[in-house]
Design a protein with these regions (language model features):
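Short amphipathic alpha-helix that is part of the acyltransferase structural core
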Residues: 1-39, 149-151, 162-188
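Conserved catalytic-core motifs of GNAT/GCN5-like acyltransferases
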Residues: 31, 107, 120, 124-144
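A short helix-loop-beta-strand connector motif used in the catalytic cores of GNAT acetyltransferases and
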Residues: 43-53, 145
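Conserved beta-strand in the GNAT
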Residues: 53, 58-68, 72-79
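Short strand-loop junctions, especially beta-strand C-caps/beta-turns
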Residues: 78, 83, 107-111
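Conserved acetyl-CoA-binding loop-helix of GNAT-fold acetyltransferases
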Residues: 80, 86-99
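Conserved GNAT acetyl-CoA-binding A-motif
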Residues: 100-115
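A contiguous, mid-protein "functional segment" used to position or interact
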Residues: 130-169
């Protein structure tokens, strides 16, 4: 019998497992899509933000960093330990998270190569829908360059108004932890 996954929020960088989580984070996401550790020090106190370590028994499985907004959770970062990839840990973690929280929005790279196409199919198998709205948020780190992303939502599509509200949320709640002094509004085409 497999042990259930647990989502245990980190409250500080001193918490058990943060070093493993940070190493996975740095290996899984490009520099411009990552915050600094100092930004996490500030974000840990934000009631809208949760940086979960994913655990099975005492074993560190991965990370799921997410935000609470009005009517949905925004999954900002999800990664599974490389040693456990291919064992459906990402599927199990995201499925459990979606069942628990309901409505979820996330962003992915446009499906333009094998990896990004597989990533989109992964989310679609879990019930996510690609929306016709692209977001262009600036990177978290200098130099600030917009990065075109596809909005995906669970369990169904979002409206243009919801996409606009999401863009406002990213600008007002999320980008304040980036290196931006006055983040520009992510634009929807």
């Amino acid at each position: 019998m497999t042990r259930p996954l647990q989502f245990i929020p980190f409250k500080s960088r001193a918490d058990k497992g943060w070093a493993e989580a940070w190493e996975l984070y740095e290996k899984s996401f490009p520099y411009n899509e990552r915050w600094s550790e100092e930004a996490y020090d500030r974000a840990f106190g934000d009631p809208n933000f949760e940086a979960d370590g994913i655990w099975r028994g005492g074993e560190f499985i991965g990370i799921l960093f997410h935000w609470g907004a009005d009517g949905y959770r925004y999954v900002e970062h999800l990664a599974v330990s490389p040693a456990l990839r291919g064992q459906n840990m990402g599927t199990a973690a995201l499925s459990a998270f979606c069942r628990k929280v309901g409505r979820v929005i996330l962003e992915i790279d446009p499906p333009e190569d094998d990896i990004s196409i597989r990533r989109r199919h992964f989310y679609e198998r879990l019930g996510f829908v690609a929306n016709p709205y692209q977001s262009l948020p600036p990177s978290f780190r200098k130099p600030f360059t917009p990065h075109r992303l596809v909005l995906m939502s669970y369990p169904g599509a979002i409206t243009y108004e919801e996409a606009r509200s999401f863009a406002d949320f990213v600008r007002e709640a999320v980008l304040r932890y980036s290196e931006h002094e006055a983040p520009a509004l992510p634009k929807l085409p």
